Regions:
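Intrinsically disordered, compositionally biased charged tails
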Residues: 1-12, 139-162
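Aromatic side chains
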Residues: 6, 29, 67, 113, ...
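Helical mechanochemical/support elements of P-loop NTPase systems and associated helical scaffolds
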Residues: 71-75, 98, 102, 119-125
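Solvent-exposed alpha-helical segments within well-ordered globular domains of core cellular machineries
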Residues: 77-84, 104-108, 128
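Conserved interaction-surface patches within small, structured recognition/assembly domains
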Residues: 91, 95, 99, 103-117, ...
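Positively charged, low-complexity, intrinsically disordered RNA-binding extensions
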Residues: 110-144
Length: 162
């Protein structure tokens, strides 16, 4: 069975595994290199390259999911839903949205989200990330051409679904 990492990297023409969130630092970062004791990241906001160390809380966007009342919803699904809802346009200034507006918009892109576990600050962060990824042209939800699919075959070690 194909895992969600494969789905995220190959079903859509984008790779969120190299886009990082670093706790305590604004915006998102692109992984650009590795060193012995750290990684080198480039800010998507200002383009500056900085080191990020193992003691910092670093999360790849493809690892992030939204708490729901059922199975957690991967962030890329929320971003895709938001892209579709907004028709490829940015969300109007998420930092100035009130709680009711945030919740209303978030319910449209993650209908079953857990209201006790997902805070307004989380919603603002998702909308801000969406705007930043959109601005930097890093959101591509077009599906790959079936003829050019990079989906692994049985010979490559992936068993067919039963």
């Amino acid at each position: 069975m194909i895992g969600k990492d494969y789905f995220c990297k190959n079903y859509f023409n984008m790779d969120l595994s190299k886009i990082l969130s670093i706790s305590g630092k604004p915006g998102l970062f692109k992984l650009v290199g590795e060193a012995k004791s750290n990684i080198i990241v480039e800010s998507l906001i200002d383009g500056k390259k900085i080191p990020a160390f193992s003691h910092e809380r670093i999360s790849s966007l493809h690892e992030i999911s939204i708490y729901t009342h059922g199975e957690d919803l991967p962030l890329y699904e929320v971003l895709k839903n938001l892209y579709t809802l907004q028709q490829g346009k940015a969300v109007d200034n998420p930092k100035k949205m009130d709680g009711k507006s945030l919740k209303s918009l978030f319910e449209q892109v993650a209908p079953d989200f857990d209201e006790e576990a997902v805070y307004a600050s989380d919603m603002k962060k998702v909308f801000t990330w969406y705007n930043l990824l959109l601005e930097k042209d890093l959101l591509d939800f077009s599906e790959e051409d079936e003829n050019n699919s990079t989906e692994p075959t049985e010979e490559e070690g992936v068993e067919p679904e039963k």
